[in-house]
């Protein structure tokens, strides 16, 4: 018997193929039946739709706020357990400002609101920000897995929504009235909306010359890059009532399709 496996897990897709073929003969009078058994995995396919413009931070002044909306839909065949958000950046320009550090510029921006389940229902919407979290720490935690930044974020974002990978889960969890809508299931049909509010800190501190300390950021600009990773539920011991007549595991389209500990 030969067996090959190929497993590919990515931000929004998964594929697993395994085929088993068996057959044999015996004696002069026999009846040979050959069956091919094919096991094919489902797919994780997350559609992230941005409901507002790209997040370009330029020509802003201290005190300004901007709002970003995201919508997630499940275009795959497996229920999505988490949608993990990571932050990166690109295209930083000093533009004549005395500050030349993109991370220092990120530290001037705070996430003041991160609303999960904005569409409502099942105990949501819920703001998971406990205290203002700056973009520098979110970047260092999610992109660099920085331990110090992670410790700070634990006090600023509801720990239930923090993943061990250093990313923030922005999908609904622990629904109060309809747990079948936790995550982003395929069945029943669902979508999740997330709203984020970012504010340019208004620091009134002045230096010894009487100049605002934030003057060094004048002219700076940066582009924020958000990425979203869909994850599956844990493994499930398949029972007869989990499949249809063709062997399709319909149970895996649902939230909480995993063995209970």
Curated annotation (Swiss-Prot):
Entry's Gene Ontology BP terms: sporulation resulting in formation of a cellular spore
Keywords from the named record: Secreted, Signal, Sporulation
Organism: Bacillus subtilis (strain 168)
Recorded family membership: Belongs to the peptidase M73 family.
Record-level GO cellular component terms: extracellular region
Subcellular location as annotated: Secreted; Forespore intermembrane space
InterPro entries per UniProt: Peptidase_M73_camelysin (IPR022121), Signal_pept_SipW-depend-type (IPR023833)
One of the Pfam families matching this protein, by short name: Peptidase_M73
Region (Disordered): 241-261
Subunit annotation: Forms fibers. Fibers have variable length and are 10-15 nm width. Interacts with obg (AC P20964) in pull-down experiments.
Domain of life: Bacteria
Main localization (coarse): secreted
Signal peptide: 1-27
Coiled coil segments of this chain: none
Keyword tRNA processing applies: no
Full protein name: Major biofilm matrix component
NCBIfam families associated with the record: BioflmMtrxTasA, cognate_SipW
GO MF: identical protein binding
TM region(s), chain numbering: none
Its biological purpose: TasA is the major protein component of the biofilm extracellular matrix. It forms amyloid fibers that bind cells together in the biofilm. Exhibits an antibacterial activity against a variety of Gram-positive and Gram-negative bacteria. In laboratory strains, is also involved in proper spore coat assembly.
Disruption phenotype: Mutation impairs colony surface architecture. Mutant forms pellicles with less extracellular material. Deletion of the gene results in the production of asymmetric spores that accumulate misassembled material in one pole and have a greatly expanded undercoat and an altered outer coat structure.
């Amino acid at each position: 018997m030969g067996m090959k496996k190929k497993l590919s897990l990515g931000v929004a897709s998964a594929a697993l193929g395994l085929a088993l073929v068996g057959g044999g003969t015996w004696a002069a009078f026999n009846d040979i039946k050959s069956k091919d058994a094919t096991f094919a995995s489902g797919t994780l396919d997350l559609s992230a739709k941005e409901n507002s413009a790209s997040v370009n931070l330029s020509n802003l002044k201290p005190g300004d706020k901007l709002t970003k909306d995201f919508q997630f839909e499940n275009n795959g065949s497996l229920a999505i357990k988490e949608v993990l958000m990571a932050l990166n950046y690109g295209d930083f320009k000093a533009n004549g400002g005395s500050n030349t550090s993109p991370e220092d510029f990120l530290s001037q921006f705070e996430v003041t609101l991160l609303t999960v389940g904005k569409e409502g229902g099942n105990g949501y919407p819920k703001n998971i920000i406990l205290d203002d979290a700056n973009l520098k720490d979110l970047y260092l935690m999610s992109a660099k897995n920085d331990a110090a930044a992670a410790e700070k974020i634990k006090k600023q974002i509801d720990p239930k929504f923090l993943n061990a990978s250093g990313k923030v889960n922005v999908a609904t969890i622990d629904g109060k009235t309809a747990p079948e809508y936790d995550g982003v299931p395929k069945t029943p049909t669902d979508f999740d909306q997330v709203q984020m509010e970012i504010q340019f800190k208004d620091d009134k501190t002045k230096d010894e010359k009487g100049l605002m300390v934030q003057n060094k950021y004048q002219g700076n600009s940066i582009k924020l890059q958000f990425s979203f990773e869909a994850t599956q539920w844990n493994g499930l011991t398949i029972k007869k009532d989990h499949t249809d007549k063709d062997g399709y595991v319909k149970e895996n389209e649902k939230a909480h399709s995993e063995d209970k500990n």
